[in-house]
Regions:
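Primarily recognizes the serine-hydrolase "nucleophile elbow" in alpha/beta-hydrolase
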Residues: 675-687, 691-731
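Catalytic nucleophile-loop/oxyanion-hole region of alpha/beta-hydrolase
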Residues: 634-635, 641, 649, 654-693
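A glycine/proline-hinged amphipathic helix-loop "lid/cap" segment
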Residues: 263-270, 282, 540-610
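Short beta-strand-to-loop junctions in surface cap/lid or active-site-entrance loops
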Residues: 125-128, 600, 608-618
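Conserved alpha/beta-hydrolase fold motif
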Residues: 10, 178-180, 696
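Short beta-strand element of the alpha/beta-hydrolase
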Residues: 619-628
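N-terminal FAD-binding dinucleotide-binding subdomain shared by FAD-dependent oxidases/monooxygenases
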Residues: 2-8, 13-154, 169-170, 183, ...
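Hydrolases whose catalytic domains are alpha/beta-hydrolase-1, hotdog thioesterase
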Residues: 20, 189-190, 705-709
Length: 731
């Protein structure tokens, strides 16, 4: 008979729950593992729709904790289909006798934290109440299908199917009139297969999505060979990579090459049939709209090359979101399907569905009858399964109410007010933006080690602090803010579910950076956590990941170049490196006008670049000085920053060059700065600026030049300075 009081209750027997069960046994914890389905596999148990397939190569989408599996299980394809992935899960479960530790067909109806006993009370669909010290949600990110938000769904008398809850026995559409509503991943994967059988297929599309062919075949030989040669290194690189797959990060900007060159590079990645390779072609496609447009146009070109009807091709081409800002899809003949005479595409933007009827669908000015309707309307992703589990923490607060305006977690693993509650691949972790197998193993390892640490050190509870949780929220937001992801209405942002908060759910900073943050937390004595036992308490409050993500990204990029330290370079070498780096940077926003000119400095002419706002003038003026340690840089080297300053402040920015060391030692730069200020003041009206509203600005060494210029003007009766903008000034 199962114990009613255990150390750990785990909800879910997908890949996360299975591995955690194995580790709980190994470390001697008592447990109950509850699974709503009647078999293991999680998302691969529930999602049996035709064409369901993993978009991560099988060389990478697998467990690493059991080395024997690498020899005992051989994948048949590069991108495995759902039946094979489910068989893999079953194979692992049988090999490690996991079936005996899982209670199938058992749902959790609710869970409450008991502050007096420091334990969770778990209520199940069987009527049993289980108490436990630790409660783990291994419920998966894509396990709760989204209900169709369409009028009249209950009226239809034909067959209704939901891709996320496909019948186990399969469906035969031969000779049927079929409607598919939705063109996300499940729609794109299932539509070609349904079209092979259906007499008539009508696809209702609201938003076109990017997709590429899988070019499926055997597992990629180059990675197979790498794994054989040095599996340990390969897997280590995966764990500290950006996505959980050990790909070499690109150092090429999409804006530094011609379109022809860019398309050639993208074509090479396209032929590999791997989404990650395509997305990794350029270093800036996720952070710069113009760079992303290069990739997006390549993808639209591919659609036009396949779909024969230009109007249909245009409808299937995404324009309203950037490549990767919604989950790209991987297909087997999706776009080719729309060349078939019995397949029709309906644009819901011009012909919206008015209602589902008893016999079909009323849309636009038409009514059509169907034998079957397939809802490929996606999932309540990442938070749906957790929130619907009716979890109540301290002081009677439910997780649903706490997350009303967006999920709040620390590391995507825990949440304030819910002691000893853990979420595997929860919101605030890389999860759906990663190779899930790598992320699952990392989370399970972290939870296992934390439970062991608590047991060995006499702690009963662990809970994050409000400071740490808020700090992590800010860090996750900062990471998202430097990308273009927030421009899209995607399920990454919760935008596919009416009423769901619109925030970035997954952590976008990368698998490796996330892992290092988790390691830092542990190495600093569980930074940001409060641990308590009957006789002791520990709280090492603080913030993890305090470096701004864009700065971290730049430093990480520089480290990949394996360059000598800047201070060891000669002036000539440093200047060459600076110019090359500047050329690779994404351009800043558009401004009204950019003109170059020369002005009189303290000892000869100085070049300048003027950035004029798009609004009518005259404008306030900021005289800007570039950074570069007084040795390198120029009036154009901070171009993206100057554009941004101009656009955001509605100010005329005049970036002025100055003489550099060692050829022109101190005080040459400062003298040039003051001379430039006086020239700009004297010529303000001709430049379109306001002489009475002049500020000085600068970055790094340029910040120093700006500050000294202001002092010189004050002390010698020069132009009146309205203000100083000093960005990381050298002092």
């Amino acid at each position: 008979m199962a114990q009613s009081d255990v150390d750990v209750v785990v909800v879910g027997a997908g890949f996360a729950g299975m591995y955690l069960l194995h580790e709980l046994r190994k470390t001697g914890f008592s447990y109950r593992v509850l699974e709503a389905g009647d078999d293991v596999g999680g998302t691969w148990y529930w999602n049996r729709y035709p064409g369901a397939r993993c978009d991560i190569a099988t060389t990478d989408y697998k467990y690493t904790w059991d080395p024997e599996l690498h020899e005992q299980w051989q994948w048949s394809e590069k991108h495995a289909a759902q039946p094979e992935i489910l068989r893999y899960a079953q194979f692992v479960a049988k090999k490690h006798d996991l079936y005996s530790g899982i209670e199938f067909k058992t749902r959790v109806d609710g869970a409450q934290w008991n502050e007096a006993t420091k334990r969770w009370n778990i209520h199940t669909s069987t009527g049993e109440t289980i108490t436990c010290q630790h409660y783990v949600m291994a419920t998966g990110c894509l396990s709760v299908p989204k209900e169709p938000d369409i009028n009249g769904t209950e009226k239809f008398t034909g067959n209704v199917y939901v891709t996320g809850r496909w019948p186990h026995e399969g469906v035969d559409f031969t000779g049927k009139r079929v409607a598919v509503i939705g063109t996300g991943s499940s729609g794109i994967q299932s539509i070609p297969h349904i079209a092979e059988q259906a007499k008539e297929l009508v696809v209702f599309q609201r938003t076109p999505n990017f997709s590429m062919p899988a070019f499926n075949g055997p597992p990629p030989q180059d990675r197979v060979e790498r794994l054989k040669a040095d599996r340990a290194t390969y897997e280590h690189e995966a764990r500290y990579s950006g996505t959980g797959v050990p790909l070499e990060d690109s150092t090429v900007s999409a804006l530094s090459v011609t379109q022809e060159e860019a398309f050639a590079m993208l074509e090479k990645a396209w032929q590999k049939g791997e989404l990650l390779s395509l997305g990794n072609t350029f270093m800036d496609s996720a952070i710069n709209r113009k760079a992303n447009d290069v990739v997006a146009e390549f993808m639209r070109m591919k659609v036009r090359s396949v779909v024969k009807d230009p109007e249909v091709a245009e409808l299937l081409s995404p324009y309203k979101h950037g490549y990767g800002t919604k989950r790209p899809c991987m297909d087997t003949g999706y776009f080719e399907t729309f060349n078939k005479p019995h397949v029709r595409l309906v644009d819901l933007n011009t012909s919206p569905i008015r209602s589902i009827t008893e016999t079909g669908i009323d849309f636009g000015k038409e009514s059509m009858e169907f034998d079957a309707i397939v809802y490929a309307t996606g999932f309540d992703a990442m938070t749906g399964a957790i929130v619907s589990a009716n979890i109540t923490g301290k002081n009677g607060v439910t997780l649903k109410s706490k997350w009303e305006h967006g999920p709040l977690t620390y590391l995507g693993l825990t949440s304030v007010g819910f002691p000893n509650l853990y979420m595997i691949t929860g919101p605030g972790s890389p999860s759906v933006l990663s190779n899930m197998m790598v992320s699952i193993e990392q989370h399970v390892d972290w939870i296992r080690d934390t439970l062991v640490h608590m047991r060995e050190n006499g702690f009963d509870t662990i809970e994050p602090t409000p400071l740490a949780e808020e700090g992590w929220r800010v860090h996750c937001t900062d990471c998202a803010d430097i990308t273009i992801f927030q421009e899209a209405n995607s399920w990454y942002m919760g935008a596919n579910v009416p009423g769901k908060p619109r925030v970035m759910f997954p952590y976008i900073g990368g698998v490796g950076r996330y892992r290092m943050a988790c390691e830092e937390v542990v190495n600093k004595g569980f930074l940001g956590f409060e641990l308590a036992g009957s006789t002791k308490k520990q709280c090492n409050d603080g913030l993890v990941r305090q470096v701004q993500p864009d700065v971290d990204m730049v430093l990480d990029f520089i480290s990949t170049l394996n360059l000598p330290a800047m201070e060891t370079m000669s002036p000539t070498e440093a200047r060459a490196f600076s110019e090359a780096s500047s050329a690779m940077r994404p351009s800043g926003p558009e401004v009204g006008e950019i003109t170059d000119g020369v002005l009189q400095g303290a000892d000869g002419e100085l070049q300048y670049r003027l950035y004029r706002p798009a609004t009518p003038g005259p404008h306030p003026i900021a005289v800007y000085f570039h950074g570069g340690g007084w040795v390198f840089g120029s009036h154009t080297s901070d171009d993206p920053l100057c554009r941004d300053l101009c656009a955001q402040s509605n100010t005329l920015i005049i970036s002025v060059n100055y003489r550099h060391a060692p050829e022109a030692p101190f005080p040459a730069a400062a003298e040039d700065g003051f001379a430039a200020l006086k020239w700009v003041h004297a010529n303000a009206a001709a430049l379109g600026g306001l002489a009475e509203k002049i500020a000085v600005a600068g970055w790094s060494a340029g910040g120093n030049v700006a500050a000294v210029t202001a002092q010189m003007s004050r002390d010698t009766g020069g132009p009146q300075i309205s203000g100083q903008l000093l960005l990381c000034p050298v002092t």
